[in-house]
């Protein structure tokens, strides 16, 4: 297979990934592949571009490094071109409502007829099968959070609250990435492709699993947080200092002992309620839990963030300032690791945002291209799979493809 023009880099160089999906969840999987060196083709509707394009800045991050193909993949010669593309594709990711592709005639079996080794990842809110009530419903971030039991665990004691921004979309996209790579490993070993059914609500069910296990195996459900503090453990969560907020985790024998000395509770160490060797203070079961919180709140309120960070570093207590977004790019850790970077958009502007992650030592990812325009690479992609100029123009004239103006 000849590849589209792009630099060779990253651990996934030589891999061809194609995705069909809008907004965040499915495309986030494509973004990860593209930043790790894969050749990633983004399929868009011919008549209507991906709705993410209406956003002023985010698409420049989420669609960088991609090749843009505008093709009607469900109709006539457009479908034929799509199936031809699948012959040279390693991973195909689609995000839609339930078994939408199968309903329109593009089943796993049809795809495998054209490429027996193809890895297919289906991403939807409720899965490819189940009950009629749910399977074909649309779903976004908050829907998946609400249906999974994840949302009800977040927020404050007074009201549940979704975790933002768009947590379920990103977790689901990462799940598609890792699952597809696992399936690809097996497909290359056996020569047989795989179909992966990723339900967003099941992804979030796993993300919310920690406290659910207490309910499933005893009937007790953890309460929600109070003003950002851990619902179970004292000294864990969000706290206010004299000049702003920190998060901390008071965990460990020595850490508790030294912290108690600082906040005036050393006399409680070694008592039946807080025996020697205590590693966590349960705010509910320990009768001194509320007192620990009261003393800690008072001590933190009397000290600046810098003072708290310095002292907690001495005591090996995990803690961090709650950074504002404007503080990120000047933070020395961000600067040292180049966590924020810049790249050029297709129209020559400079865009700033998060860098490629994680950092591969021997085969690093990179940003080589900004977001392509609607249909920008259609002609190049179709030529790559054997279409002539006349073939491409015929697809365009029939409204089955769009090329860059």
Curated annotation (Swiss-Prot):
Q: What is this protein called?
A: L-carnitine CoA-transferase
Q: Is Cytoplasm found in the keyword set?
A: yes
| Domain of life of the organism encoding this protein | Bacteria
Question: Cellular component terms, GO, for this chain's entry?
Answer: cytoplasm
Q: What is known about its subunit structure? A: Homodimer.
Q: Reaction catalysed?
A: crotonobetainyl-CoA + (R)-carnitine = crotonobetaine + (R)-carnitinyl-CoA; 4-(trimethylamino)butanoyl-CoA + (R)-carnitine = (R)-carnitinyl-CoA + 4-(trimethylamino)butanoate
Q: Name one molecular function that GO assigns to this entry.
A: L-carnitine CoA-transferase activity
Under which EC number(s) is this enzyme classified?
Answer: 2.8.3.21
Instruction: Kindly give the SUPFAM superfamilies that the UniProt entry links to this protein.
Output: CoA-transferase family III (CaiB/BaiF)
Tagged with keyword Cytoplasm: yes
Extract the Gene3D superfamilies matched here. Crotonobetainyl-coa:carnitine coa-transferase, domain 1, formyl-coa transferase, domain 3
Which UniProt key words apply to this protein?
Answer: Cytoplasm, Transferase
Cellular localisation: Cytoplasm
Q: GO annotations under biological process?
A: carnitine metabolic process
Q: In which pathway does it act?
A: Amine and polyamine metabolism; carnitine metabolism
- Which gene is this protein's source? caiB
Chain segments annotated as coiled-coil in the UniProt record: none
InterPro entries found in the cross-reference section: CoA-transferase_III, CoA-Trfase_CaiB, CoA-Trfase_fam_III, CoA-Trfase_III_dom3_sf, CoA-Trfase_III_dom_1_sf
| List of residues binding CoA | 97, 104
* Pfam families per record: CoA_transf_3
Name the family.
Belongs to the CoA-transferase III family. CaiB subfamily.
| The protein's role, per its UniProt record | Catalyzes the reversible transfer of the CoA moiety from gamma-butyrobetainyl-CoA to L-carnitine to generate L-carnitinyl-CoA and gamma-butyrobetaine. Is also able to catalyze the reversible transfer of the CoA moiety from gamma-butyrobetainyl-CoA or L-carnitinyl-CoA to crotonobetaine to generate crotonobetainyl-CoA.
Q: Which residues form the active site?
A: 169 (nucleophile)
